[in-house]
């Protein structure tokens, strides 16, 4: 299973290649040793640990399954070269004791308590759902951050509305609320939450190319009783540009930075990588801020194995990144999207990124 959500690595390294296997009484067959439950029962024999290690990397400038990983249409794009690889952490769980010992002894994986992957109050399905939502959010933020960096207009668009909610329609562009401009979804959420359930607000919307005012009721949220409108909104390019992301079976927010750089590279005449193999990680917010992630040492290891010569790491992950083995890979510290683009330009010019 590949995950992207931040997880705190176990404080003590579990890597000691000298294992005294004679201290472990081995009395069962190899088949029995690999069992994770007693046959014919629901008794779980798996250890309460997961193994974390380097996962696969994906070139956000490349293709997967015959599709561009980052696919842009509706506007002029420019040729790219090289690599901007997002990196992953591979997580294995549901292991028997011998399987866990084998991974501990023969790989660079680290064992972490299973609760760090699947909290006690959440099922694997719930965690996976959260990871998928975080991944989708990273895609949306990547689009917003890239378009803002390139000074291209964005719009808050209605994606869906409750049944019977006829005041607002799918495809409406929300320009303002009660006369105040809406620049991003958070602006609308904040404005609505300043009202009480049952109030009415006036939205300034653009529908079929025409602006109009629409009065809508403030509803009560189902999960936290907070005031809401009940509509699903998304920030999209306002100039007809469409940006789609094509990676399946990946979860979590840490692909955001590399997705954003791919969008910027494809929409910029200048080739940002100059054919070089760059990898990295980091969350991205809609304003271009880069946030920390989990498993950075594993991701650097994955990048090295893939052939990267530079790795972009969030500033908050620098201490861990520097403490590990990164020989042959230049580390670039980034706080925001502008830092990341600057680092690419410095490497292109033959300089070492700051």
Residues covered by each model-derived region:
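Terminal targeting segments of Actinobacterial cell-envelope proteins
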Residues: 1-16, 105-113
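Hydrophobic membrane-insertion alpha-helices, especially the h-region
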Residues: 17-37
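Extracytoplasmic low-complexity, Pro/Thr/Ser/Ala/Gly-rich segments
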Residues: 35-111, 346-354
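Conserved mixed alpha/beta catalytic, RNA-binding, or beta-rich assembly cores of soluble enzyme
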Residues: 93-98, 102, 108-128, 139-140, ...
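Terminal peptide-recognition signature
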Residues: 147, 171-174, 203, 231, ...
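PDZ-domain C-terminal substructure recognizer with occasional recognition of PDZ-binding tails
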Residues: 190-233, 323-349, 354
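Glycine- and Gly-Pro-enriched alpha-helical subdomains that act as flexible
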Residues: 266, 286-311
């Amino acid at each position: 299973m590949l995950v992207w959500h931040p997880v705190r690595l176990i404080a003590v390294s579990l890597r000691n290649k000298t294992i005294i296997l004679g201290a472990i009484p081995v009395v069962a067959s190899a088949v029995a040793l690999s069992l994770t439950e007693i046959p014919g029962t629901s008794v779980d024999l798996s250890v309460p640990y997961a193994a974390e290690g380097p996962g696969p990397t994906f070139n956000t400038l490349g293709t997967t399954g015959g599709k561009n990983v980052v696919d842009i249409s509706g506007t002029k794009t420019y040729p790219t070269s090289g690599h901007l690889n997002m990196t992953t952490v591979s997580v294995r769980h549901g292991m028997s004791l011998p399987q866990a010992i084998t991974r501990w002894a023969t790989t660079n994986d680290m064992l972490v308590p299973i609760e760090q992957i699947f909290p006690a109050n959440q099922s694997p399905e719930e965690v996976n759902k959260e990871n998928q939502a975080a991944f989708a959010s990273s895609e949306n933020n990547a689009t917003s951050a890239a378009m803002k960096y390139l000074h291209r207009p964005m719009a808050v668009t209605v994606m869906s509305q409750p049944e019977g909610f006829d005041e607002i329609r799918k495809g409406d562009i929300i320009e303002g609320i009660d006369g105040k401009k809406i620049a991003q979804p958070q602006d609308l959420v904040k404005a609505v939450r300043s009202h009480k359930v049952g109030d009415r607000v006036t939205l300034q919307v653009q529908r079929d190319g025409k602006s109009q005012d629409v009065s809508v009721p403030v509803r009560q949220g189902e999960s936290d009783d907070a005031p809401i409108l009940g509509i699903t909104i998304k920030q999209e390019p306002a100039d007809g540009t469409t940006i789609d992301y094509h990676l399946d079976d990946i979860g979590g927010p840490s692909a955001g930075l590399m997705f954003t750089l791919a969008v910027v590279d494809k929409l910029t005449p200048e080739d940002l990588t100059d054919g070089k193999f760059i990898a990295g990680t980091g969350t991205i917010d809609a304003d271009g801020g880069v946030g920390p992630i989990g498993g950075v040492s594993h991701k650097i290891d994955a990048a090295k194995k893939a052939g990267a010569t530079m790795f972009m790491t969030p500033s908050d992950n620098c201490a861990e990144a520097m403490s590990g083995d990164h020989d042959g890979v230049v580390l670039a510290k980034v706080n925001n999207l502008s830092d990341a683009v600057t680092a690419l330009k410095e490497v292109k010019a033959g300089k070492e990124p700051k």
